């Protein structure tokens, strides 16, 4: 099945199953070996150093139902500097950059402990970063059907809860061909009546939602009023 682990340290136990980074896929074993569909497959295996794959590590973050994997990116990177997180409860993926070389879940310690390539030890999931942050989430390219028609977006119908509305800003970019120039269609603020007017067209549309004030918020499903247009 070509499910060989990329390194011994990438094998992680999480409850009643284990998971690991294979040479070209992510796998899990709970009595049978399964290939795990991975939305960020290309991010892992296109970025990963061919020479230093053996330095990949994995760790369990049980409080959040997460498995973390660190890996080196680029030909000259000898130690892990990027990570991918699989939430096995929600089956969602996260990515990022972080210098970590090992991970120990909570147990002997109250919090997960991780070390970096310089020998420093960090307590994870402890406290918050200081200073203002701009959290956001961004979609991949959205298309109508097989991408053979242009999409005209006329209206945005958001679903948001915040202490003071509107708490979020939504922005769009688009392309008329996958390899074409990306066009910025600007930002839109969620209106209190639940409708935000817009008018732009593209074959591929990407959406980005950003918090615009320092407050808690929740984001539900965002609906778009989209009409198909011609093929050119």
Language-model features: locations:
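Beta-sheet repeat architectures centered on beta-propellers
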Residues: 3-17, 23-232
């Amino acid at each position: 099945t070509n499910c060989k682990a990329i390194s011994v340290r990438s094998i992680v136990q999480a409850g009643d199953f284990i998971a690991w980074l294979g040479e070209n896929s992510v796998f899990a074993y709970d009595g049978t070996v399964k290939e795990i569909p991975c939305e960020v497959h290309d991010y892992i295996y296109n970025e990963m150093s061919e020479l230093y794959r053996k330095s990949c590590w994995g760790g369990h973050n049980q409080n959040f139902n997460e498995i973390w994997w660190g890996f080196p990116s680029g030909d000259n990177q000898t130690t892990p500097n990027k990570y991918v997180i699989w939430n096995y409860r929600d089956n969602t993926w996260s990515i990022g950059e972080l210098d970590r070389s090992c991970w120990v879940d909570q147990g002997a310690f109250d919090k997960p402990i991780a070390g970096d390539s310089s020998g420093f030890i960090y307590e994870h999931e402890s406290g918050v970063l200081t200073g203002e942050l701009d959290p956001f989430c961004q979609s991949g390219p959205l298309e109508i059907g097989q991408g053979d028609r242009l999409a005209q977006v006329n209206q945005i119908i958001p679903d948001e809860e915040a202490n003071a509305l509107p708490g979020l800003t939504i922005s769009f970019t688009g392309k008329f061909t996958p390899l074409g120039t990306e066009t910025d269609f600007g930002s839109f603020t969620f209106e209190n009546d639940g409708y935000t007017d817009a008018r732009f067209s593209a074959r591929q549309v990407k959406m980005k939602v950003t918090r615009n004030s320092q407050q808690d918020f929740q984001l539900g499903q965002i609906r778009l009023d989209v009409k198909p247009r011609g093929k050119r």
